[in-house]
Amino acid sequence: MWGVVNLIPTKEEWNKALAERHGEKLQTKFSSVTVAICGLGGLGSNVAISLARAGIGKLILIDFDRVDITNLHRQQYKANQLGMNKTDALRDNLLEIAPYVTLETHTICVKEENATHLLQGADIICEAFDNAECKAMLTNLVLEEMPDKYLVAASGMAGFGSANSIRTRKITSKFYLCGDEKSDVQSEGGLVSSRVMLCAAHQAHTVLRILAEQFET
């Protein structure tokens, strides 16, 4: 029986394939950008996968947590990664998908005291926290202390509500909010993979639209 040959494309082949899908000019822009993802749970891990597949040049991955069995139904981790730092597990998974993406990882909790340092190298910041207070902290900090950076945040993706209620709204010229803006775990009774991934897809797509200069009205 013939063995399976595991052939990784060269970087040139990889970039050429992406350019065929996105156009060379836009792909060059994608590959030159750094996106920070704050929180690597149901939102952040899925955002990271989408952006890595799109050929974003560098991702800054930030999360303090470890992979838990309750994460597996909606987050981009595997059963054999239980107990690993999410930063390490997601790094491994991303490099299997997109071998030439540059990854910077920080296994740390984002706080007011360290956020500016952690995010200063990013062109676009994705807020992907679970906690409402953390969401508010990061949003306010970016808007007040890093007004030159784009922020793509999320609010409302719990339960079995209609997929069509997930939307992207432009709040300011550099602040976008994805989600239904009302559902939460307490009122809806839980999180469903498909709806969380839908919101994450809105976030990732918004990042790509910003880079393509196709802004929401």
Please provide the spans of the model-predicted regions.
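Glycine-rich phosphate/adenylate-binding loop
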Residues: 2-9, 118-124, 128-217
